[in-house]
Amino acid sequence: MKNFKNTKKESFLSTIPTASIELDTDRLTVKCKFNFSYFCNSQSAGQDFKDWDNDELVKLFEKLKNYSEKSLNDWKTEFTGRYPVFVIYDNFPRKSDFELPKNLPHQVKWARFHLENKVRLVGFVIPDNFHDKVHQKTRERFDKNTFYIVFLDKEHRFYITE
């Protein structure tokens, strides 16, 4: 039996670059990540996913996809109109219709993404001094580029300014 080669095919395939996380051009390590493990849908000031209509959910996931293209640090310098896209508040706000969930680590820094108009995505990040630190039990590293989503805030009730 003869072994046939398709040299045109092999030549063409060799021109297609191979993606790799080891390439200098790869930006996987700087793209922010979203985590829903602390999501709280039990407070009346916030909403659950089922409370948002299809268009609102589509907008939310389009924003998450867009925000995933950069680091959290990059988003602190971006604006949507006159509002920063991403803000870290450090502490839970004094004036809020939300209550501080009891299951969150006390070290967290509260933050939010501005989605549109009054709509905010509220959560937290870990402090810079925990970044790359190894957790004593899991042996995994903390990552300051992860946004932990806690609340959906459709009416800007997390950080009351008026």
Model features per residue range: what roles?
Residues 118-127:
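Catalytic nucleophile-His microenvironment captured as a short glycine-rich beta-strand/loop
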